[in-house]
Amino acid sequence: MGNKTHPTGFRLGVTEDWRSMWYADSSNFGKYLNTDLEVREFIRERLKNASVSRIQIERPAKNALVTIHTARPGIVIGKKGEDIDRLRGEVAARMGVPVHINIEEIRKPEADSKLVAESIAGQLERRVMFRRALKRAVGNAQRVGAQGIKVQVSGRLNGSEIARTEWYREGRVPLHTLRADIDYGFAEAKTTYGVIGVKVWIFKGEIIDTENEGAPAERVKRAAAAQG
């Protein structure tokens, strides 16, 4: 039987970029990685009402640059920038280096997989029927330009005795195509019956690099010439 690979990890270095971008030797790698995980968890908990999609961390020359992608930048910044200044200080204390925070606004939250998954999870926690929540999310994503979307929920749906998986798809979601821009997100709904997992795949089109088109073929030719 085939197993599904993570859509983002599958495309790293092709159409997706890493969430943490820094270099460290073997003695510091574990410490940096653990710090990144702690900072992400802290920011998500601190800004749980700000619709945060993803957090990118860079470490240039004894500094840190944290980029927060959010649909509600006003909540992150706060009145006269007070909240973001406080957040910067707290993150710097955890990372042990000066921190600069960038805020990137998400213009279309209906087409962001992480925010869509969290929205569905929130509706399930408020006892909305899962089929209604799924169809609403699919319709909203297509309305703002998504070429395809698949949503899946797993668990004790509507309080049933036996856990099951239900999914709904509209349009194309080509998971095997590396050049396909697939946005994948996951969230959990904590209901009185247990945890329900929510997965969302959104296809936004194909990324075609016209400048390097044919480059792999050229590399094969050069390698063959070198061997021959």
Curated annotation (Swiss-Prot):
Keyword hit for Zinc-finger: no
GO MF entries: mRNA binding; rRNA binding; structural constituent of ribosome
Protein name: Small ribosomal subunit protein uS3
Cysteine-cysteine disulfides: none
SMART domains tied to this protein: KH
NCBIfam families reported for this sequence: rpsC_bact (TIGR01009)
Matches recorded under HAMAP family: Ribosomal_uS3_B
Complexes and interactors: Part of the 30S ribosomal subunit. Forms a tight complex with proteins S10 and S14.
Annotated Pfam families: KH_2 (PF07650), Ribosomal_S3_C (PF00189)
InterPro entries the UniProt entry points to: KH_dom, KH_dom-like_a/b, KH_dom_type_2, KH_sf_prok-type, Ribosomal_S3_C_sf, Ribosomal_uS3_bac-typ, Ribosomal_uS3_C, Ribosomal_uS3_CS
Superkingdom in the source lineage: Bacteria
Stated family: Belongs to the universal ribosomal protein uS3 family.
This protein's encoding gene: rpsC
Keywords, alphabetical: Ribonucleoprotein, Ribosomal protein, RNA-binding, rRNA-binding
GO cellular component, one term: cytosolic small ribosomal subunit
Keyword Ribosomal protein among record annotations: yes
GO BP field: translation
Protein role: Binds the lower part of the 30S subunit head. Binds mRNA in the 70S ribosome, positioning it for translation.
All copies of domain KH type-2, residue ranges: 39-107
